[in-house]
Amino acid sequence: EAKDASVTVVNNNVNIVPEQQGISIDKATLEQIIKELQNSEDTVRQLPVQFTQPKVLSRDIQSKLFKDTLASFSTVFDTSNENNANRGENIRLASQKINGKILAPGETFSFNEVVGPRTVESGYKAAHAYSNGEVVDEVGGGVCQVSSTLYNAVLRADLKVTERVNHMFTVGYVELGMDATVSYGGVDFKFVNNTEWPIKIEGWVSPDNQLTFRLIGTNTNPGKTVHFYSPGATVIECPVEYIDDPSLPSGQIDVLKEGAPGYSVDTYKIVKQDGVVVSEEKLSTSYYQPMKRVIRRGIG
């Protein structure tokens, strides 16, 4: 039986397994030849060998492997102060871990598994991050921009997302409902290469602080496009906490924390084939908590 050429991914290396020609023998004809040889002095016969050709050849795979950009997405960040510069370094380190990763068909990508622990020993720095309802300095702060940027590229390539959680509070580098938070040992971002070909992830940071992920594979349906929209977010007003201070004159107020509203947003995915809508589905509901506004008021 003929065997088609195939492709495997081992230790992030792509291997093409060559095709094999199929060989078989017509049993009925062979039995007839054997009978004839038993009753004949002629001992030379041509065996009834049949050859079958594989449908997929090595050169076919080689010509299609990593030839198309399935999707790309970029976000930007600022490095104008120490905190943001630290964020930028964390973003650069995490994107380098992902750059060049190759996924076999059916393979699952785990952000935490690929990027690994975000530690000082690995070069990560302390920067602002969300933790337990507060903005705190955390080693690896900013890495969620990497996972969110990759999430957007993955969505546009129409790959299957199996684990994604939005941030506790809103973020400024992607639209509402389009972020993906991560925490090593906790929340992860995962997706599956649900195509029939290997996919290579390219990720880099440009000199002007733009983070880009590009997914390279084989586009077997160039007429398909994927779009996303949110019909509108429900605004959740931020709670206000007052701290009475007798040392301040009555009526005087001092805003200690500005606070921010929360949001609930539904995100939908539309798939078009040659410009015609073929499917529409709800992708996710993302809930962002409001940040408490804290005001000190004088009662003296």
Model-derived regions: residue spans:
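Well-ordered beta-sheet/strand-loop patches within structured domains
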Residues: E1-G300
